[in-house]
Amino acid sequence: MAAELTSTKLNAENHLLLDQPLLRLPHELARRNFKSVQRLVEREREYVIPALKEAANASLSNAQTPDQTLAALDSMLARMQNLKRKMESIQQEEKKVQNQSRKRIQHLEHLHQIPSLADVKYDQWSRIRLDRLVVDHMLRSGYTESAQQLAQEKGIEDLVDLDVFVQCQRIAQSLRRGETKDALQWCNENKAALKKSQFNLEFELRLQQYIEMLRTGDRGKLMDAMAHAKRYLTPYTETQSKEIHRAAGLLAFPQDTKAEPYKLTDLQSMYSFDRWNYLSDLFIRTHHELLSLPSSPLLHIALSAGLSALKTPSCHSAYTSSSSNFLSTTTSVCPICSTELNELARNMPYAHHAKSYVESDPIVLPNGRIYGQQRLLDMSKKLGCVETGKVKDPTTGEIFDKSEMKKVYIM
């Protein structure tokens, strides 16, 4: 009885290892909002306090007319009102983030109130988490409308990061369309954080603008490209000198050049249109890094743990490939061998089995596969299409004579 209770006891801390991003993102958004307010206040303070002193001194010394003093005060009031509007907008975002954090903490707190895995409340909590993981996967895959609808139907809008991923996908799609405006605006809003990033997103975007200027072949654009490079690319000379030297070569080689490595057909060429897909992927990686989001969908991470517990050497053998062998019966019962999960599990480690369970009457077939004799005979009857005196391998579909079976002895 004690062993049974131990096996079903719920360890909340282990379960929450997968849910760290649930609280990490709201914390990151709150930190960014605080930094934004801090920058706004400091910028306005640096302007208003000196301007106020200057206006007061000028008024006392009669250096300006009353109308000029009023105009200066009106200008300062306008800036303060603009600051107030910006801070009110940030405050609304902050309230939303705090509400999300509260709902997420409550969701995780419910897990600590569940004593056993057999409790019906655990099934309910797990269902909510599964819905969250599915929505997360759909958002990362670009199915934003379906993800929003699912989150709304399940009532988990505060437990998923809809707005963050919608913005991410919108900017990523704009890059695939060949537009850099939204991505550069995002870089400007996150300039301070990008300085600590391992990716050089802004440099790559400015480089792409330079490439597009030269792609036209217009001589007028040539001068614009040179000015653009001087303004936006040269500041990266210390870290991106190799790429800048390659980019300088574009001034001598037009888009239709056959010279390596600038010709259009070369995938590594700066003229290649595949660079837009590269920029889109680079933006997504940078975005996730700045917001402390996992690079892989949480659903994949959760599945990987279970897949490694089920995986055996036969799951990816030449005989059980679900894509090449339609006779395989493992495709319907083994998650690893299923079409949907086969590739995801390919790089997973095999399950560690401390105990071995062996059939009492093992035999080996000519193809090297080992089964229990009685179970093989029963399975052959169930599969049908087997002549008398023959058996069918349930994994590969091959048919052999019973006389070809050899008894296996385990030492």
UniProtKB/Swiss-Prot annotation:
Residues 133-165 form the LisH domain. It holds the Pfam family CTLH. Residues 171-228 form the CTLH domain. It is found in: Cytoplasm; Nucleus. SMART domains: CRA, CTLH, LisH. GO terms for molecular function: ubiquitin protein ligase activity; zinc ion binding. One of its GO terms (cellular component) is nucleus. Keywords: Cytoplasm, Metal-binding, Nucleus, Zinc, Zinc-finger. A zinc finger (RING-Gid-type) spans 334-396. Its main location: cytoplasm. One of its GO terms (biological process) is negative regulation of gluconeogenesis. Belongs to the FYV10 family. Involved in the proteasome-dependent degradation of fructose-1,6-bisphosphatase. This is Protein fyv10. The lineage of its organism: Eukaryota, Fungi, Dikarya, Ascomycota, Pezizomycotina.
